[in-house]
């Protein structure tokens, strides 16, 4: 399992600038633009409901704008698809100007794709003499089709290893814990970069007036701050501030986990902040981050790549709580307690799209992560008498999948309908 865990971490913990759904749209649009001949006259974008939900209202770094149109237009303008999830980093003023001109021309059409896939992006570009099409499915960089003028340039479903994806469900918490505890430090120290990268964004979020300023207001000095200046509030503030900045379009890279920057924030910053407060070594932090990330990836596999439930608030925060428990000296039993406590607490947190209020959910999840770690380290756990929690932590995690598949079938449709109706009424 050692090689599988390392391969998984290197595949699922990767940098991105901006929210991953609009970036994936920009990536697809960039590839399509690179193959089109002539001046673009029409842009047709077909998206799964989950992608629309997560791209509709989120800030696009460096643009001052939000949403799908500007992301797609930037991809067309930039045409640097080799950058993948960092395609929106360091674009020029001329590229931004061209993108805004494309948006202003009103040639971008966005439609919902009738598909069972949670993550589906299709971008079709038309000129007077040419047509190109690109499809991304399942994960944010998995290009399955490139077509230009009815010629198939690439038709490939092999980039995503379905075997590896399915293996995530086989990751047992006991095995993850043992790997985190026993792995050679030289093999896992690369994971420290996730904390360093994400804490830089947190620092920016605490300094600037980003989004709802959830993080900065927790630690502000003044007569009207009800939060005390204690360790837990500093951890919550640091975590929320990174999301404040990211969701408001801060042009800094974030290390994602399982396809999401907010999941990366949620499972790394609380762990790094706790390690610093406890004066832990880099090796101890790396082991806690490995545990946190792998638990996040395992839970997220049961939730789905995109989900009606909040991946950062549930999977990411549960990973963080496990990492915190580990840093506090917790053993496997304490880790199991921690997971049962977290899922008992946060399993109903919905995902109503990527937007500035994600920082509120990060704050809520981080608070729960600290609270549940504290209970777990004291030998206190939710039991099989409590709701969807099972005696076996593996069954508790699997119950999330059952909840989504059987209980939340229509939730995404309902959420998206509310969002689109609101957008229509606000025009």
UniProtKB/Swiss-Prot annotation:
Pfam families noted in UniProt: SDH_alpha
Domain of life: Bacteria
InterPro entries with a match to the protein in the record: Ser_deHydtase-like_asu, UPF0597
GO terms classed as biological process: L-cysteine catabolic process to pyruvate
Alphabetized GO MF terms: L-cysteine desulfhydrase activity
Family: Belongs to the UPF0597 family.
Protein name per Swiss-Prot or TrEMBL: UPF0597 protein CPE0806
Organism placement in taxonomy: Bacteria, Bacillati, Bacillota, Clostridia, Eubacteriales
């Amino acid at each position: 399992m050692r090689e599988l865990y390392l391969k998984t971490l290197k595949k699922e913990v990767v940098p991105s600038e901006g929210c991953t759904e609009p970036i994936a749209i920009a990536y697809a649009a960039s590839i399509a633009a690179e193959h089109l001949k002539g001046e673009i006259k029409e842009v047709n974008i077909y998206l799964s409901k989950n992608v629309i939900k997560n791209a509709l209202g989120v800030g696009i770094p460096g643009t001052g704008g939000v949403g799908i149109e500007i992301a797609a237009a930037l991809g067309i303008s930039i045409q640097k698809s080799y950058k993948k999830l960092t395609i929106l980093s360091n674009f020029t003023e001329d590229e931004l100007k061209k993108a805004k001109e494309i948006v202003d021309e009103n040639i971008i059409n966005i439609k919902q794709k009738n598909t069972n896939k949670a993550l589906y992006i299709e971008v079709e570009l038309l000129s007077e003499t040419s047509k190109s099409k690109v499809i991304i499915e399942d994960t944010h960089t998995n290009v399955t089709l490139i077509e230009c003028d009815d010629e198939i340039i690439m038709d490939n479903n092999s980039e995503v290893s379905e075997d590896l994806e399915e293996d995530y469900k086989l990751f047992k918490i006991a095995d993850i814990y043992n790997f985190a505890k026993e792995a050679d430090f030289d093999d896992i120290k690369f994971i420290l970069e996730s904390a360093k990268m994400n804490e830089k964004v947190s620092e920016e979020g605490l300094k600037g007036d980003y989004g709802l300023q959830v993080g900065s207001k927790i630690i502000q000095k003044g007569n009207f701050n009800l939060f005390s200046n204690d360790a837990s509030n500093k951890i919550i503030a640091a975590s929320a501030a990174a999301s404040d900045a990211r969701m408001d379009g801060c042009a800094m890279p974030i290390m994602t986990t399982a396809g999401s920057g907010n999941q990366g924030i949620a499972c790394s910053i609380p762990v790094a902040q706790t390690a610093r407060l406890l004066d832990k070594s880099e090796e101890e932090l790396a082991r806690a981050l490995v545990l946190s990330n792998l638990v996040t990836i395992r839970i997220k596999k049961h939730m789905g790549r995109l989900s009606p439930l909040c991946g950062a608030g549930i999977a990411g925060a549960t990973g963080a709580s496990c990492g915190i428990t580990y840093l506090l000296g917790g053993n496997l039993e304490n880790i199991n307690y921690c997971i049962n406590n977290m899922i008992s607490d946060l399993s109903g947190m919905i995902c109503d799209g990527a937007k500035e209020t994600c920082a509120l959910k990060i704050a809520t999840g981080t608070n729960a992560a600290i609270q549940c770690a504290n209970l777990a380290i004291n030998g206190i756990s939710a039991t099989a008498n409590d709701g969807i929690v099972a005696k076996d932590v593996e069954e508790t995690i699997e119950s999330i999948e059952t909840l989504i598949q059987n209980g939340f079938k229509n939730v995404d449709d309902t959420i998206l309908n509310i969002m689109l109706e609101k957008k229509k009424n606000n025009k």
